[in-house]
Amino acid sequence: MLCGAGPAPADEDHLQARALVEAGVILPLERILDQVAAEHPGRVLEVEFEREQGRYVYEIELVDDRGRVWELEYDAENAKLLEKERED
C-alpha cells in the first residue's frame, strides 16, 4: 500500500498565497517582482512567502550586476519594502 505524504510546505505556502491574493488580502507576487525589478535590478534567486509578526511578507533573494546577493523583504499587503540586507 502506498501512502502519500501530502503537499510539501512550499506547496502549502503557494496555495495559501494564491487564496489570499484571490481574496484581495495580499498583492500577487508578480506585482512585487515588478517593483523589485524597478527598484533593485538583478536576477531573482529565491522567493519565500511567510507570515512574520502578524503580517504576510515576500522574502526575495537576488544577485545584482556586481555579483552581490541581497535579501529583500516586502509587505505582501502593500508592497512596502520592510528590510534590505546584503548577504555575505
How does the language model describe each region?
Residues 1-88:
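Long, terminal "pre-/pro-" and other extracytoplasmic accessory regions
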